Each structure stands twice: as C-alpha cells, then as structure tokens.
Amino acid sequence: MKIAVLTSGILPVPAVFGGAVENLIDYYIEYNNQKKLHDITVYSIAPPKSSHIVDTTNTHYHYIDTTSFWGRLKRHIYVRSHSSTYYNPYIEYFLYESLKDIAKKDYDIIILENRPGYAIPVSKVSKARIIIHLHNDLLNKNSKDAKEICKVCDKVITVSNYIKSRVETIGAEIPIETVYNGIDLERFYQATPIDRKTLGFKEDDFIVVYSGRLIKEKGIEELIDAFIQLKDYPSIKLLILGGSFYGISQNNPFLDTLKKKCETIKNQIVFTGFIPYELLPNYLKVGDVAVVPSMWEEPFGLTCVEAMAAGLPLITTNTGGIPEICKNAVHVIDKKEINNLLYLQILSLYKDSPTLNKLGKIETFDKNVYAHSFLNSIK
C-alpha cells in the first residue's frame, strides 16, 4: 500500500532531536524497510542538513522547510495572513504545506500522528483512508470537532486502553484499537551501568532513579518530599536523570519551590542534567529502584517501560494507562495517598533488598513487536 505519515510538525523525523512520538515512527519505518511491506512517505519539518537522511526503496521523506531564510519568510507570511483553526499557526503552516503535496498523490492510507485536528483538512484533499495514531488524550467528548473528526476517519489506534476509553466517550461508530508502544529492549538489556563513583555515589548507596522533566505533573515534588522524610537514611540517594535547575533563566515558582526543598537534602540528590537517549539505559542501570510518581493521567508511561527493561523494580502511581502497562510487575500506589505511601515504599525496598531482582522480572515491550502490531492494525 501507499501510505503517508503526517507528523506533529514540531520535531523532525527521523528523530534526530528525540521525541517519544518521533522515535515510535522511526521504529515502524525501520521495520517496514526490513520487511519491505509498504511504500511510505513521511511528511516532517526539515531536519538539520548535517543529518544526511536519504530515502530508501520503501521510505521517502517530504520535508517542509521552516528554518532557512526563505522557509521562515514563507511561514511568517502564512502566520500573518491566516487565523488558526485548530492548532497554533506554526503547526497549521506545516499542515498547509504538506497538504499541497498530498493533494497531488494517490495514497491508500494517511496516518495522522497524534494530530486528530488534521483529519478534517486532510479529508478535503484526499480520498485515502484516514487513521489517527493517538498518543495522548486529545480526542474525547470534550475535544473540538470530536464527532466530525470521527466521521471523516476510518480508524483510531491508541497507545493504551485508557486512551481508547477516552475516545469511546465520544460515542462515535469508529473502530478503535490499542497497540502498545515499544522500545529497543536490546539496548537496555545490553547496557553497562555508569560507574557509580563518577556520579558521586558510594558502592553501598541505595539509589532511587527518577527519569524525566522537573514539572508538577510528573510528581517530582512528591518524590523530593519523600526524600525529606528519608533524611535519616543518608545512604538512600536520589538520581535525577535529564532534569536540572541549572540553565533555566525564566522565573518559575514551581522550580523555586523545588530548589528550596532540595537544600535540606542536597547530600542525597544528584542531578545529571541532559542525557542523550542512547545513554539512558546506562544511567538507569546505576539505580536499585526506579520511581515514576506521575500525578496526571499518563497516556502510556514509556518511562515505566524503560525502567522495567533496565531490570529495575518500579514504584509508580495508578494514573492513566500505567496500571495496564505495569501489571504484575511493580508497586502501584494510589496517587491520592502518595505523600504517605511513597517514602514507606522506598524504605521497604531499601530494607528488603534481596527481593529486588525478583521484583524486576516483568513483561516487556519490544520495538519490533510494536512495529509489527502497528502495521498489522492499519490493514
């Protein structure tokens, strides 16, 4: 089949700048190239010229220039002369330019990656089947034009049953299928841990790993509060991957609060700052346990999968799609009771470390299983 993939219009594909959705696109493109299944054209903003990205027999890239002088000028003219209809004008410029090419092509399927708002404009220029690949809670009974979007689409593929249940609130007669995300498990299995001493830890420290941004929704404040309760256990340490207070110049009251709280336990916390994704497995494996204390409704919980793939026992919350992703493998606590339960759970694992390996054996999510399932679901 001839397939078009419309990306978010924010980050390029291939995922030279990272991005969870962009990485997942790369996985099924890579799998499709190996199996030679479909002719796929990816519509994306242009990556840096130094990336040396080339088409293959089965994959073609149609890039929208948003960074050169002429690209920025064209986008500026569009933004000044058009009002937004669904997304911000920069995303809608990307869609506008992509549709000019799509209208000339004869695709069988057009996949909308996490952009349900693309559906109606796409339906006006193409007779292809439209499939939404939904990574977040962006299509439910309260979403703009929800019923109209479902009418022009042929299917919705969701990353979890939680997201599926949110789409079902619309009450539309449209097929909805869950295909779980995947990661490169071999990269996590084969990774060698970073030397603890280079991070300032002792060999006998009990290291709790948090991977993610320093934002309220991710539960980082609740985790720091738990460590304040654990300050009488100096060998329990917190390793924060990817997050840092440094280099953030804008006024941020939430980060200011975190800074003040961290002062009381500064000898128990290490911030790594930015870490390239390819090194994440090496850093995760430094830990004894991972904590994903999400306080919002996680659509999937990719961070949980990464921790489990690294062989770490996991403490997380009962939010969104996390319980279905992590069943039988982790300690799931009620987010309403997190202030009472999180430090107790960390302390319990610290005192009962012989059980850690047993707790770390869990079901896994492989990128090739994901890619195979996803490409099967669009038939």
Language-model-detected regions and their locations in the chain:
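Short hydrophobic beta-strand element within catalytic cores of glycosyltransferases
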Residues: 313-316
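Conserved donor-binding/catalytic core segment of Leloir-type glycosyltransferases
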Residues: 157, 202-218, 224-227, 239
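Glycosyltransferase donor-sugar binding loop
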Residues: 237-256
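Acidic anion/phosphate-binding donor-loop and adjacent secondary structure
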Residues: 142-145, 165-168, 183-198
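Nucleotide-activated donor-binding/catalytic signature segment of Leloir-type glycosyltransferases, i.e.
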Residues: 124, 252-275
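A charged, aromatic-enriched C-terminal amphipathic alpha-helix characteristic of glycosyltransferases
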Residues: 89-93, 337, 351-379
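Acidic donor-binding loop of glycosyltransferase active sites
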Residues: 285-299
